[in-house]
Swiss-Prot record:
Gene name for this UniProt entry: LACRT
Segments for region (Disordered): 20-79
Statement: the UniProt record of this protein carries the keyword Glycoprotein: yes
InterPro entries in UniProt: Dermcidin/Lacritin
Protein name per the record: Extracellular glycoprotein lacritin
Amino acid sequence: MKFTTLLFLAAVAGALVYAEDASSDSTGADPAQEAGTSKPNEEISGPAEPASPPETTTTAQETSAAAVQGTAKVTSSRQELNPLKSIVEKSILLTEQALAKAGKGMHGGVPGGKQFIENGSEFAQKLLKKFSLLKPWA
């Protein structure tokens, strides 16, 4: 039982790290490019030349539009799912995967390995019922 608890806690920690990495990746865009600012070393065109928007503006607009769409997707998904439920779902999934992988090697080598795997699966099912979660990965 202690091993199962430690395995579950490791899965929760892994899910938290994964969630934090995913959120930091979406905010890693260059702020100067999103704001549409130009580089300070660029030459200023004279008054005789026609005023045309630089190409970096269109790139910045595309980048900011993509960032807005990405932010909207993240916001809508967060509104739909409670973040705690999402973390619990991920940790249960990781626990089930770890138990499945452990079960492949334990059945023949360790006495009581099959019972350990069955108890771990029952534990994951109890958690699903306790938090009233559906299995989205099944």
